Each structure stands twice: as C-alpha cells, then as structure tokens.
A protein has these predicted regions:
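Loop/turn elements at helix/coil->beta-strand transitions in domains of secreted/extracellular proteins
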Residues: 18-21, 85-87, 115-121, 144-149, ...
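Subtilisin-like serine protease catalytic core
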Residues: 12-22, 29-42, 52-102, 190-193, ...
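Active-site-adjacent substrate-recognition loops and nearby beta-strands
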Residues: 152-171, 176-193, 205-218, 259-268
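Hydrophobic single-pass membrane-targeting/anchoring helices
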Residues: 317-379
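C-terminal subdomain of the subtilisin-like protease fold in secreted/lumenal serine endopeptidases
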Residues: 186, 240-335, 372-377
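Hydrolase catalytic cores
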Residues: 65-68, 201-268
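Solvent-exposed loop/turn segments at secondary-structure junctions
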Residues: 27-31, 46-48, 72-74, 94-98, ...
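Substrate-binding/access-modulating region of protease and related hydrolase catalytic domains
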Residues: 93-165, 212-218, 222
C-alpha cells in the first residue's frame, strides 16, 4: 500500500476551505444530512419542481457535496470532505441530458452559481451536447467571471469517442479517475481534454436515502469532487489568486503516473491530483499569468448524449447508516499517498470506511470518518 499521511496535519492546518462557496450542479443536495448540516446554502432548482436545490431524490449530489465539504458527526463518525469548511450551493438540474430542458437547466445553473458568488463549480455530470451554444456561453461566462469549473470526463471508458461535455468545454478542468494504485480506472473516459485524474474507486460518501445514509461508488464523479475541494482549499488559502492560477497550481503540482507514463496524456492529463503540493508556495504560478490555461484548449469530438440517460451514472451501493464498528486508530482522516520525485501522490483520505465494496455490490455501514481511499449525467 502507498505510504500514508494525516490529512489533519498536512491539509487542514493549512486550509479547510473557509469562506469559499462551491456550487454543486447535480441532483440537489440534502441539507439535513448529518454530515452536511449547516454547510448547505439555499440554491436553485432548474428541473421545474420549484425547490431551492436542497431536495435530492437521487442521492448523487448529496454524495458529491459530502466529499467536498462534509464535516462528519458525533465522535469522529461519518464523511469528512477535503474542504470541510467550504459552503455548498446546490444547483439542481435534470439528470436526463438528452432533454432540452436539462440542457437549458445546465446553462442556467452555471450562470446562477456564478451570480450567487460560487468560486468553484462542481459538475459531476456528463453526456451533454457540445453544440449547445447556451451552455457554451454559460461556461465562458463563468470563466470570464473568475470561477473554477470542474467536470467529470465520463464513465464509458474506451467506448466513448472522447471526454464528455461539459468537461470538454474550453476552460473546464476535465477529471478522470484512478484506482488505489494510481492506475487509470477501467471505465474512466479519456481524451486530449483530460486535465487531471483523482481517486474514483471504492469511494465512501453520503447518500440522500436518509439523513444518516451512506453509500460506496466508483466513478469520475467522485474524482471531480476531490478536484473541486482542492480548488476550494487553494482559493481559501490564496484568495488573491485568479481562477486560472488556481487551475495552474493543481496542474503544476500534479504527481506523475506511478507507471512512468509521460504527461500530459489522454489518460492522465497532467497527472494525479496532489492537494498538499497544490497548497505549497509556488511563486512561479502565483506571479504568472492570471488567464485560465485551459481556455484555448482544442476540442476533439465530444461524447454525444447517450440513448440511456443512466450511462455514466456511478452506481451507488447504499448503506443504511454509520453506526457500525470502527476502523481502529483515532479515526481521523488519513491520506494514502506516495512520494514520487518529491511530490506527494494523494490517493485520498481514508478514515474508518462506512462500507467497503466494489461498485455493483451491496455494503454494510461502518463507523468513523469515511473520507474515501483517494478521495452524467451523474458520473
């Protein structure tokens, strides 16, 4: 196993995401989940149901929010996000991307997030059309307003032509998934737009099945949440940096692949997300260009909306609660990583697992912070 380090000693004393609003454009976020209580702001609902975004009938958005800003509960139980003091702005959109209402909802959701002060926008969704000008202009609006946009590459693996939209839009950080060993997850969609990869296998997260619900999943959705959380950590610690400089920090600090593959590449992008390195002093980036380095990125043929809107959706194994046995130790978050060329390869923060199972299997809830082992529509 890769060498580990304590998140509470390397990440959280430096930054916890204080003062940063992260918009989660997804299925909504359950504001009453015990690990998110007090973290979720009133948002918006673009599905036509008239909520404020704090309704989540699927559970996916709640899971993403927990990986970003979960604070656990009780005696070190539940899910801790990488940025536990960031605030979540829920933006509920339809999860049927072939629907024109859904396409329009994404565009409106992005603009809403920007206008409500989000500094980071997490889009763990995919399968949208790259030809939709309303969404394209909304992405540009966010980039022009100094917002970090992060989206999942897709969960179709080699079956997809390339990275899905909205991740493939210029200016968006497109995120793929790696497993515990830092190897590409077999279903992670890849292409020239891939920017970074992050942990996305056997990820424990909150679920909206109940206020004490949890689940386990594989997917680029989870990887995307970790990148968004890291962006929040950077924005909290370095508030004067532009969104482009935040993106550049994550790119420049990424760890090379464990298999020695050259980067940038279609599978790894610029490498594996390394939050601790991204928070270190980096004058060459901080004093460099403020423009988004991805704004001029070439677009290959994006993956079209699938006939089955559930394609690419991470299948969550749901656990009923988090009241089972602990994982030993003090239960605080441990980040599993490896030192490569002086850089820490962050594979994630694991504390006691809420459940441990491969995707597509059922799990049982456990106790202790469930920060996963590395950390579209719904991916």
């Amino acid at each position: 196993m890769l060498a580990g380090y304590q998140a509470d000693s390397l990440l959280w004393p430096t930054s916890q995401g204080d003062g940063v609003v992260v918009a989660v454009i997804d299925s909504g976020v359950m504001k009453d989940h015990q690990d998110l209580a007090g973290q979720v702001l009133p948002g918006a609902d673009f599905t036509g149901e008239g909520s404020d975004g704090t309704v989540d009938k699927d559970g996916h958005g709640t899971g993403m929010a927990s990986l970003i800003a979960g604070h656990g509960h009780g005696d070190k139980a539940g899910i801790m996000g990488l940025a536990p003091r960031a605030k979540i702005l829920p933006v509920r959109v339809s999860w049927t991307p072939a629907d024109t209402v859904a396409q329009s909802g994404l565009a409106k959701g992005i603009r809403f997030a920007v206008d409500r002060g989000a500094k980071v926008v997490n889009m763990s969704i995919g399968g949208y059309s790259g030809t939709d000008q309303e969404t394209r202009q909304a992405v540009k609006y966010a980039v022009d307003h100094d917002v970090v946009l992060v989206a999942s590459s897709g969960n179709s693996g080699q079956q997809a032509a390339s990275v899905e939209y909205p991740a493939a839009f210029p200016g968006v950080v497109a995120v793929g998934a790696v497993d515990r060993q830092g190897r590409p997850w077999e279903k992670s969609t890849f292409g020239p737009e891939t920017t970074l990869v992050a942990p996305g296998v056997e990820i424990n997260r909150a679920s909206a099945k109940s206020s004490a619900g949890y689940g386990v999943a594989n997917g680029t959705s989870d990887s995307t949440a970790y990148v968004s959380a890291t962006a929040a950590l950077i924005r909290a610690k370095y508030p004067n940096l532009s969104a482009g400089q935040v993106v550049n920090r994550m790119i420049k600090s990424a760890t090379p692949p464990t298999d020695g593959s050259p980067v940038p590449s279609d599978r790894y992008g610029y490498g594996v997300l390394a939050p601790a390195k991204a928070l270190e002093a980096n004058p060459s980036v901080d004093n460099g260009p403020r423009e988004n380095p991805l704004s001029g990125r070439r677009e290959s043929q994006g993956a079209p909306p699938g006939d089955d809107p559930t394609d690419g959706v991470s299948e969550e194994t749901v656990a009923p609660g988090a009241d089972g046995g602990g994982a030993g130790g003090n239960g605080m978050g441990v980040v599993a990583g490896a030192v490569a060329g002086g850089a820490v390869l962050v594979i994630g923060v694991v504390v006691a697992l809420v459940a441990r199972a491969r995707r597509r299997r059922r799990g049982v809830a456990g106790q202790g912070y469930g920060q996963p082992p590395y950390g579209g529509p719904y991916q």
